[in-house]
Amino acid sequence: MGGSAPPDSSWRGSLKVSYNVGPGFTGNFSTQKVKMHIHSTNEVTRIYNVIGTLRGAVEPDRYVILGGHRDSWVFGGIDPQSGAAVVHETVRSFGTLKKEGWRPRRTILFASWDAEEFGLLGSTEWAEDNSRLLQERGVAYINADSSIEGNYTLRVDCTPLMYSLVYNLTKELKSPDEGFEGKSLYESWTKKSPSPEFSGMPRISKLGSGNDFEVFFQRLGIASGRARYTKNWETNKFSGYPLYHSVYETYELVEKFYDPMFKYHLTVAQVRGGMVFELANSIVLPFDCRDYAVVLRKYADKIYNISMKHPQEMKTYSLSFDSLFSAVKNFTEIASKFSERLQDFDKSNPILLRMMNDQLMFLERAFIDPLGLPDRPFYRHVIYAPSSHNKYAGESFPGIYDALFDIESKVDPSKAWGDVKRQISVAAFTVQAAAETLSEVA
């Protein structure tokens, strides 16, 4: 093989060859290719989800879900067992509270999914089986896959409804990072991973796909989020982490290289567990619809700027984003008024409290289009969806974005720009309809 020499003598065998690690080959073999024959066996196998329930004391028909998968390709030292360990410890912590007489206000469901690596099968089948219940009762889903993919700083992907919850929670937790002793997790996170849009705040990314939150967020419209420790993406630009899904992804890898003291696991457990606790126990749901208004404006500006790369076509086909900007403006105003009412209403009135919480809970559902995205019926969230070109990454206003993508090479320009116009209408209608769900009840 070509490439560099092995890093250690233990990698060398007894043959009279170089034992280089690649890539490619040397000498007479440099132009040759290796042909592999792969023989796979397809069979139907039973899978098992494990669901634990901690019944709520006041609103047992409102569900907060903490879920992660336990199946792995090989040993799964990081993916998924670093996440499964956090779920187990979180369950144990809540169990200790229950033994002391405590119960959450709302019901907490703890889920261990099977067959995630085979296409998110466990979580998807369970959510489909229980879709009617979840649509009526699901408050939030917190994903608990791998707790670490590095040991540099926190990484959070979530709905904008959870931004304030995450900010407030991380301000109360101690940072595990070296050089930040005595400082909060929020401070180290902001310093190491600043938001590119909001000065003085940490980066929170959009939810994409490739994990068990997909069916809850993208299909059912249940507010979702996830947190883990990550690497420095500025210096480590490769995707994933070394040894991902390999036979070398073991407990020893975590213990010796990633988290010898398990302090990052503890921090992730505190973030995930803290989010579940607040979502299940707060009298008023810790969702802030104003944060949604802010990002909607940002996303509308972004997609408009993309479309303006084609000014002549915009004019020719009478394309306008006025309806979308108007809907975003209305959403912003109504969200602001709703937040004012949220501060002043009588929280001792159980009917009024339930009504306000329901408006918050169902806001994410309001962004769901039952028809789904064009050619992607299982993705129904109008504001967020996995990128058509990278399933793991999230895209905003995906219907418009996909319609605009590579539009100059479309065979029928009139039809292509008609599709863009149609998706603008869908987005504008959805944002306006979502705004109306926050209006004061007559």
Curated annotation (Swiss-Prot):
Binds 2 Zn(2+) ions per subunit. Required for NAALADase activity. Glycans are attached at N28, N151, N168, N305, N330. Pfam families: Peptidase_M28, TFR_dimer. One of its GO terms (cellular component) is plasma membrane. Kidney and liver. Not expressed in the prostate. Its EC number is 3.4.-.-. Ca(2+) binds at E125, E128. The lineage of its organism: Eukaryota, Metazoa, Chordata, Craniata, Vertebrata. One of its GO terms (biological process) is proteolysis. Zn(2+) 1 binds at H69, D79, D145. This is Putative N-acetylated-alpha-linked acidic dipeptidase. Its main location: cytoplasm. Substrate binds at E116, S209, G210, N211, R226, A227, R228, Y244, H245, K391, Y392. Has both folate hydrolase and N-acetylated-alpha-linked-acidic dipeptidase (NAALADase) activity. It comes from the Eukaryota. The active site is at E116 (for naaladase activity), S320 (charge relay system), D358 (charge relay system), H381 (charge relay system). Keywords: Cytoplasm, Dipeptidase, Glycoprotein, Hydrolase, Metal-binding, Metalloprotease, Multifunctional enzyme, Protease, Zinc. Its cofactor is Zn(2+). Belongs to the peptidase M28 family. M28B subfamily. The keyword Metal-binding applies. Zn(2+) 2 binds at D79, E117, H245. InterPro entries: Peptidase_M28 (IPR007484), Peptidase_M28B (IPR039373), TFR-like_dimer_dom (IPR007365), TFR-like_dimer_dom_sf (IPR036757). Transmembrane segments: none annotated.
